[in-house]
Design a protein with these regions (language model features):
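Vicinal oxygen chelate
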Residues: 6-15, 57-141, 144-153, 178-179, 224-288, ...
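Conserved donor-binding loop and adjoining core beta-sheet/short helix segment
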Residues: 35-37, 45-70, 93-95
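Short, charged/polar, Gly/Pro-enriched secondary-structure boundary elements
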Residues: 48-53, 113-116, 186-190, 250-251
């Protein structure tokens, strides 16, 4: 059975691409590749040529999710698994592969209608090292970009799809959330059963240093970026993080220090709470 190996890239549809470029570089510490002739902005965080593709759609939500597989045979096997499960699959065109800068990809909607791409052969730029404008380093490599958390209306059906068709493994549960891993990162995907106006609840990027999280936290507190949840430590992945609002209205989690999964010893559990401590919403402005 073929299985995805990492969260390779995320596509976001936004209404203000210039504001996103400022936020991504000056706050998150990602590197901009600039805005291309199609009006799309791509962002780096490691040796991959891009991890985020920002498109000026006005949607202010998730545009697509890109999951990586090892090679072309794995991609073809995955396409077969999807079709066998009743999912309509199309191959990426030459122009689409060129746009994503991959050797090959397939496209489909997951059971909740999330536009999803599975690809192989991303371009790696060791000759052009990632250079963060804020001197931030990120935990990626075999762990991929980070994670995304998606709102779904039917949790059981969607869990079965990502586990039984895409080959992900359940890490644990918290209330109405299911967490999945496809490499040592505790979760590359989480699903929350909830009716919400946006498909994307948040995405997460993990820094190599707690100092980077702390410095960014100070920047948010001292500036005009909305803080949605203060510093805290999660029960399941043990990450120390905080949440802030992006220019599109969904959140980004900025964290450090998550534990990893060893499948030879890992056991699925259900946590009673989401955080060991912290992650509290900010004090209401009226209390100031």
């Amino acid at each position: 059975m073929a299985a995805v190996t990492q969260l390779g890239y995320v596509g976001l549809g936004v209404s203000n691409i210039e504001e996103w470029e400022h936020f991504a570089t000056d706050v998150l510490g990602l590197a901009s590749n600039g805005i291309d002739t199609d009006g799309n902005l791509s962002l780096r965080m490691d040796e991959y040529s891009h991890r985020f593709i920002i498109q000026p759609t006005g949607k202010d939500d998730l545009q697509f999710v890109g999951w990586q597989v090892t090679d072309e045979p794995a991609l073809r096997e995955m396409a077969g698994q999807l079709r066998d499960s009743g999912i309509e699959v199309t191959d990426g065109t030459d122009d689409e592969n060129k746009s994503r800068r991959v050797e090959g990809m397939i496209k489909f909607d997951d059971p909740e209608g999330t536009p999803t791409e599975i690809f192989y052969g991303p371009p790696i730029s060791f000759d052009r090292p990632f250079n963060s404008p804020r001197a931030v380093g990120f935990v990626t490599s075999e762990q991929g970009l980070g994670h995304v958390v998606l709102h779904v209306e039917n949790l059981d059906r969607t869990v079965e799809f990502y586990r039984d068709v895409l080959g992900m493994k359940i890490s644990d549960f918290i209330r109405n959330l299911a967490f999945f891993h496809c490499n040592p990162r505790h979760h590359s995907l989480a699903l929350i059963e909830s009716k919400a106006p946006k498909k994307l609840n948040h995405f997460m990027i993990q820094t190599e240093s707690m100092n980077d999280v702390g410095a960014t936290y100070d920047m948010v507190l001292d500036g005009d970026i909305p803080l949605t949840r203060g510093l805290g430590r999660h029960t399941n992945d043990h990450m120390t993080s905080f949440y802030m609002k992006t220019p599109s209205g969904f959140d980004v989690e900025y964290g450090w220090g998550a534990r990893t999964v060893d499948d030879s010893t890992w056991q699925v559990v259900r946590h009673e709470k989401g955080s060991i401590w912290g992650h509290r919403p900010p004090v209401a402005a009226a209390a100031k």
